[in-house]
A protein has these predicted regions:
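N-terminal secretory signal peptides and thylakoid transit peptides that target proteins
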Residues: 1-17
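Hydrophobic h-region of N-terminal signal peptides that target proteins for export
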Residues: 19-23
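C-terminal motif of bacterial Sec signal peptides marking the signal peptidase cleavage site
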Residues: 26-27
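Short, conserved catalytic or interaction motifs in soluble domains
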Residues: 30
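Gly-Asp-aromatic-enriched flexible segments
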Residues: 36-202
Length: 202
């Protein structure tokens, strides 16, 4: 290889390496992993996952594959959460039972009157039993403002919306039916929920 050709070759290799490093650091590659809560969708909304809860805890982007019963993935949503009442650190936000047999978790966020509504998508996770179900509630300044319909194994994706206009703080409650086993079965009734694209709108 001639001297000039070698120099050009090394310049090309160096540029390619820098481009690869930039993709790795910025996450701009189309095949990059799940986007974090800081992702800017350019629609004026704020990811709920970017707020720090002052009470309670919900485990956003908890590393569990957010695939629904139809095989659709929500891993490229602004945020996501998979909720199953089972063993494992990824489920530790569902610490309590309700009297009617639901695993329960919640988080409260200070929103300081900045937002008019909270929206998200609800879908049955692939671990949802055939008789399982799940639902959520939203409170604004301790007043119940929205309750979702039950999410069941054969449910379509639900576009959920809660009016939180003027609220200083909001509370999101998650209820997952806690049955006897995960998976198909005649008595299977465990719930398994995907919450995705939880956004606050000014």
């Amino acid at each position: 290889m001639k001297k000039m050709e070698r120099r050009k070759f090394l310049q090309v290799i160096g540029a390619a390496a820098l481009m690869g490093a930039a993709v790795f650091l910025t996450g701009c590659d189309e095949s990059s992993p799940v986007p974090g809560p800081e992702q800017d969708k350019g629609d004026g909304s704020v990811s709920l996952a970017s707020l720090e809860a002052f009470s309670g805890h919900l485990n956003w982007n908890n590393g569990v594959e957010p695939e629904d019963v139809s095989g659709n993935s929500y891993s490229r949503a602004a945020n996501y959460m998979v909720c199953v009442f089972s063993n494992g650190a990824e489920w530790d936000f569902l610490k309590s039972y309700t009297s009617d047999g639901y695993g329960y978790g919640f988080a409260e966020y200070r929103v300081s009157g900045k937002y008019k509504k909270l929206t998200m998508k609800l879908a049955p996770h692939k671990l949802m039993n055939k008789d399982g179900n799940a639902y959520i509630k939203v409170y604004a300044d301790d007043k119940l403002v929205a309750t979702s319909e039950f999410v069941k194994k054969k449910s379509s994706v639900i576009d959920f919306e809660a009016n939180i206009a003027g609220a200083e703080y909001i509370k999101l409650e998650v209820y997952i039916h806690a049955g006897s086993c995960i998976g198909e079965g005649s008595d299977g009734n465990d719930g398994a929920l995907i919450m995705a694209d939880a956004k606050l709108w000014p």
